Regions:
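C-terminal transmembrane helical hairpin of 12-TM major facilitator-type secondary transporters
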Residues: 279-285, 289-291, 296-350
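Hydrophobic core of transmembrane alpha-helices in multi-pass small-molecule transporters
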Residues: 25, 96, 107-123, 247, ...
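Helix-loop-helix hairpin linking two adjacent transmembrane segments in secondary transporters
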Residues: 151-200
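Extracytoplasmic gate region of multi-pass secondary transporters
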Residues: 31-42, 231-292, 378
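Intracellular juxtamembrane helix-capping segments at the cytosolic ends
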Residues: 42, 122-136, 342-355
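Helix-to-loop junctions at the C-terminal end of transmembrane segments
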Residues: 67-80, 289-300, 386-387
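Cytoplasmic helix-loop-helix junction between adjacent transmembrane helices
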Residues: 114-149
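Extracytoplasmic
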Residues: 15-41, 46-50, 67-71, 159, ...
Length: 425
């Protein structure tokens, strides 16, 4: 009877999932996914070219890439202070975006972006995966999918809201709105987060008393780990193919994301249509992330790698031909809802399947840091290519090739890993 009652108790880990959803909603959904709204209005008012202006997002991503390694080490050494690091990141990121609203020179945006990068990783995957891995053994995939779906919810809501605010009150008010709304999302998350179940006198979801968790480390279940070490992984071709695939995927995905609204308005669509299309992308993402995770569990790593690449390829092709008919922006929205989701959900799944869980965190952090280059330079690359070609058409042609390369690389990595059995060592 007591066991039955215990099972029916609400598990605080789902509060942690909700908190992670809020972190992703602000850190990715607002701070990253809504940046494209500001490209045209800022450049037109301040006289910037699009390439140099969008470099500020590259700077923020580049600084964040190295900050991720630092936070990874800090989280390892001082796990009890993770919530404090997230609180610090909240202040830094919200402050930086408010600072954008006061900027008048390019270097203002660059300096604030570098400042933003020092805190942005606390609101990203490293915090999310650490918290969820601490709290869940079973249903970890579901918890992860739900958490990352937060970016789609917030972006779907905030894209049309910010577009309207920028049109009616100017881009400066738009940046201020981003800062204040994000602060309202992040403060409750910081207050509710608990780093481990031990802080609430609990065990991870799926671990029963006496199973897995030792007396001295109640928050860390002792599970049998399989796979290869990071030292072994970096000596395999599969590891570098995995990174190349992730790098290409990030280049195409982030290269499109920040320029969709600008491109659609350039080819004759209204700002309302463009923002609605981007908002629909974020809406589709809410369901796509959860659906992709469930499908991956069913079909295995090699088909999952193929599906991942196809989602991105279909997105670029749909955007390339967005001018064919008035329905095409919405076809793109459907495709990119899945394509954009491949920048989060497949990474941890494929790395875990290809290389195992023995040193998953070490392999994942290294691969993510390197592949983050694609996320950081892609918006600026698209802007620079636009300035060079005079339109986005050839930019999308290039990204079609990049998406094919991503598909081939990820599939090859999964096949090699399966043949060699890296994940089963």
């Amino acid at each position: 009877m007591q066991q039955t009652k215990t099972k029916k108790k609400f598990f605080y880990g789902w509060v942690i999932v909700f908190c992670c959803t809020l972190l992703v909603a602000a850190g990715t959904g607002i701070f990253v996914n809504c940046l494209g709204i500001f490209v045209k209005p800022v450049c037109e008012e301040l006289g910037f070219d699009r390439g140099p202006f969008t470099l500020y997002s590259t700077i923020g991503g580049f600084v964040g890439m190295f900050a991720m390694l630092a936070y990874g080490e800090l989280y390892r050494r001082y796990p009890q202070h993770i919530r404090k690091f997230i609180a610090l990141g909240t202040v830094v990121c919200c402050g930086a975006f408010y600072g954008y609203s006061l900027s008048t020179k390019l270097w203002h945006f660059y300096a604030l972006a570098a400042f933003y990068g020092t805190g942005s990783m606390t609101l990203a995957g490293i915090s999310i995966t650490t918290l969820i891995n601490n709290w869940f053994v079973e249903k970890r995939g579901l918890a992860t999918g739900l958490a990352f779906a937060g970016s789609g919810v917030s972006a779907a809501v905030m894209t049309p809201v910010l577009t309207t605010i920028v049109a009616d009150f100017g881009w400066r008010m738009g940046y201020r709105t981003m800062s204040l709304v994000s602060l309202c999302l992040l403060v409750p998350a910081v207050l509710l987060i608990r780093v481990s179940p031990a802080e609430k006198g609990l065990l991870p979801y799926g671990v029963k008393p006496g199973e897995g968790a030792g007396e001295n480390t109640p928050h860390i279940p002792v599970l049998q780990q399989t796979g290869i070490t990071r030292r072994q992984a970096v000596k395999t071709p599969a590891f570098y193919l995995q990174i190349l695939g992730m790098l290409c995927l990030g280049t195409a995905g982030m290269g499109m994301s920040g320029h969709v609204i600008a491109y659609l308005t350039d080819i004759g669509y209204s700002e309302l249509t463009a923002s609605t299309a981007m908002s629909l992308v974020m809406t589709v993402m809410i369901f796509a992330k959860i659906l992709l995770g469930a499908v991956f569990d069913k079909i295995g790593p090699v088909p999952s790698a193929v599906l991942t690449g196809i989602c991105m390829l279909a997105s670029v092709v749909a955007l390339r031909f967005a001018g064919v008919g008035s329905f095409m922006p919405y076809v793109f929205s459907l495709c990119f809802g899945f394509g954009y989701s491949t920048l989060t959900v497949p990474y941890s799944y494929l790395i875990g399947q290809n290389f195992g869980t023995r040193e998953f965190a070490a392999i994942y952090s290294l691969a993510s840091m390197i592949s983050s280059l694609g996320n950081s330079y892609a918006p600026s690359l698209s802007g620079t290519l636009y300035d060079f070609f005079g339109s986005y058409v050839n930019v999308w042609n290039i990204y079609i090739v990049v998406s094919v390369a991503a598909t081939v690389s990820l599939t090859a990595a999964a096949k090699i890993s399966r043949q060699k059995g890296y994940g089963r060592y």
